[in-house]
Amino acid sequence: MMPDMIKDPFARLGLDREVLTVSQLNGRARVLLEDVFSSIWVEGEISNLSRPASGHVYFTLKDSGAQVRCALFRQSAARVRQALKDGLQVKVRGKVSLFEGRGDYQLILDTVEPAGDGALRLAFDALKAKLSDEGLFSAERKVALPLHPQRIGIISSPTGAVIRDIISVFRRRAPRVELTLIPTAVQGREAINQIVRALKLADSRGFDALILARGGGSLEDLWCFNEEAVARAIDACVTPIVSAVGHETDVSISDFVADVRAPTPSAAAELLAPDSSDLHRRVDNLHRRLVSRMQDRLMRERLRLEGISRRLRHPGERLRQQSQRLDDLDMRLRRALEQTMHQRQLRLAHMQSRLAAQHPGRTLAFLRQRLDALAERLPRAIREQIKARKLQLQSQVQTLNVVSPLATLGRGYSILLDERGHAIRNAAQTQTGQRLTARLGEGELHVRVEDNHLTPVTLSLLD
């Protein structure tokens, strides 16, 4: 399956050389973009800001070399504390999507933050420096995670995707591990005291390890995990703590103080759930111990049999029977051992197959090929676009030269202008003795009207 996907990357999109409509193409392109760029941070300057009556916010995010359209829908816009305006430098988070009606790709945003050092960022850096100087981040204070924890406490919100993701990982990898949720708020001022109390309670319950978890959000949303009280409560815990706050790009003070930092709540669960490699090692150890004990048992029985045979004057038929019985037992033991090993190998192969099926390498290989293909096509498309623009510009310059009034003047014609610079199109617009300016292809003449009949006007050069 993997070689086929590498050979034909479009198979994953279900194209298979079929002819698509424009709507189908845009729809599939949107799915691909949203899958690959599901959550990214981008920094740039706001321009063309628009706030329609719907409550949504639209603007263009640009830098010195490029720009991209952005959409901040009403629900997300209501959470933005910063007043947005043209020229504001911001950091935004969202997913890349495609507006199918126009075929234009855009960013669908959920977070907008001012770029640069804001008040929260300065407070973060100050507390980080203070706690670091006190040694709260030092490796000597870290406690190693248990290899096979049986009881784990989870400090998080009782609702939302975070707790569901953690439970899902343990059900899949370690269903026998006992999980206990210590519910707490994970956002707002009241969350600080609740998290501190939850940490103290969990540390007193004798858990093998603790997970402090929250989903992603803005710096302000995650701020309770950057409070000094929470940091010191984590440091005071005897139980090993895994901090899993926000997305992989989010970093909080609790990450530095905790014994281990996980990029996501799901990753924290995987750190504490036994993996297949550990199970493999255990099976190998059991196999070696079983083989060693069976060999020892066989050796003892052979030695015992040899001792008995030496003590007997006429072993005869009894020895042959015992030897045959021993051979039979040896064969049965070998068959039982082989069957046990075969079953263990089948089980191990099945677990390895399941693990390989979930490996991200396949998706990464496809995306890497797709990225290489796009990288090859991009320079060629840019060159073709520049060439087309140059041809269009040359054509427009030629057209302008043809219709330019300067070209007409260059062929010997002139334009008469009155004192206000207005062009004279009719003799009735002039008066006898009126001073006019005649603009030629090169330079101009100052003239005076001698006669203003509808017949050709008689002019004389002024001294």
Curated annotation (Swiss-Prot):
Which GO molecular function annotations are given, in alphabetical order? exodeoxyribonuclease VII activity; nucleic acid binding
Q: Its Gene Ontology biological processes?
A: DNA catabolic process
Major enzyme class? hydrolase
The entry assigns this protein to a family as follows: Belongs to the XseA family.
Catalytic reactions of this protein: Exonucleolytic cleavage in either 5'- to 3'- or 3'- to 5'-direction to yield nucleoside 5'-phosphates
**Biological role:** Bidirectionally degrades single-stranded DNA into large acid-insoluble oligonucleotides, which are then degraded further into small acid-soluble oligonucleotides.
Q: GO cellular component terms?
A: cytoplasm; exodeoxyribonuclease VII complex
Which domain of life does this protein belong to? Bacteria
Query: What binding partners and quaternary form does the record give?
Result: Heterooligomer composed of large and small subunits.
Keywords, sorted A to Z: Cytoplasm, Exonuclease, Hydrolase, Nuclease
Q: What is its EC number?
A: 3.1.11.6
Offer one Pfam family short name for this entry.
Exonuc_VII_L
Q: Which CDD domains match?
A: ExoVII_LU_OBF
Q: Which organism is it from?
A: Pseudomonas syringae pv. syringae (strain B728a)
User: Where in the cell?
Assistant: Cytoplasm
| Cross-referenced InterPro entries | Exonuc_VII_L, Exonuc_VII_lsu_C, OB-fold_nuc-bd_dom
This protein's name: Exodeoxyribonuclease 7 large subunit
